[in-house]
Design a protein with these regions (language model features):
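Phosphate/diphosphate-binding glycine-rich loops and adjacent basic-rich segments that engage nucleotide
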Residues: 137-183
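A glycine-rich phosphate/pyrophosphate-binding beta-strand-loop-alpha-helix module
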Residues: 41, 90-145
Length: 183
């Protein structure tokens, strides 16, 4: 399965939804090595992901995350940033706090800094916030105070497997800059 997906990607052919789902499932189940994950990331970066492939990857990643279902009447907001800002402060975290203070329920996704001065997890830890919440704790906080931090490594197990390869490569792929904020 992996070899056919890599072959298609390096030949600049589009992946089907099923191929993407199979790949994400294989990553989640540790059926693909870190080197193979990195190979796919580079091949996809070189080819350029189509809108359909981005949608398929985001959908597959969402179906493989830890679900949250807080009991709130309003739509739940997320202010996940894309990382690598212009050497400014962490805008996505500040936005989450302001939105929650205005009464909008927020599930603020984020992680540690990879390419910027401070990731959301770094900022919140510096403020004394517990970032290692269980799904039940996050749901309760959203219901009671209107905001919870959703630490990506705990809620997105597949992302935990693709980001180390991206970090080792020293390049940004769609997983960090596009897929992360979408899921």
């Amino acid at each position: 399965m992996y070899k056919s997906i890599l072959s298609k990607t390096t030949s600049h052919q589009e992946l089907s939804e099923q191929e993407v789902f199979d790949l994400i499932k294989a990553i989640k189940n540790d059926e693909i090595s870190d080197a193979q994950i990195a190979g796919f990331q580079v091949a996809l970066l070189m080819k350029g992901a189509s809108l359909e492939e981005i949608a398929y990857i985001a959908k597959a990643m969402r179906e493989n995350c830890v679900p949250l279902k807080p009991d709130v009447k309003e739509d739940l907001m997320d202010t996940c940033g894309t990382g690598g800002g212009l050497s400014t402060f962490n805008i996505s975290t500040a936005t989450a706090i302001v939105a929650a203070a205005a009464g909008i329920p927020v599930a603020k996704h984020g992680s540690r800094s990879i390419s910027s001065l401070s990731g959301s997890a770094d900022v919140l830890e510096a403020l004394g916030v517990n970032i290692n919440l269980t799904p039940a704790q996050a749901e309760r906080l959203i219901e009671e105070i209107g905001i919870a931090f959703i630490y990506a490594p705990l809620f997105h197990p597949v992302m935990c497997k693709v980001l180390p390869a991206e970090t080792d490569l020293g390049i940004k792929t769609i997983f960090y800059t596009i897929i992360g904020p979408l899921i």
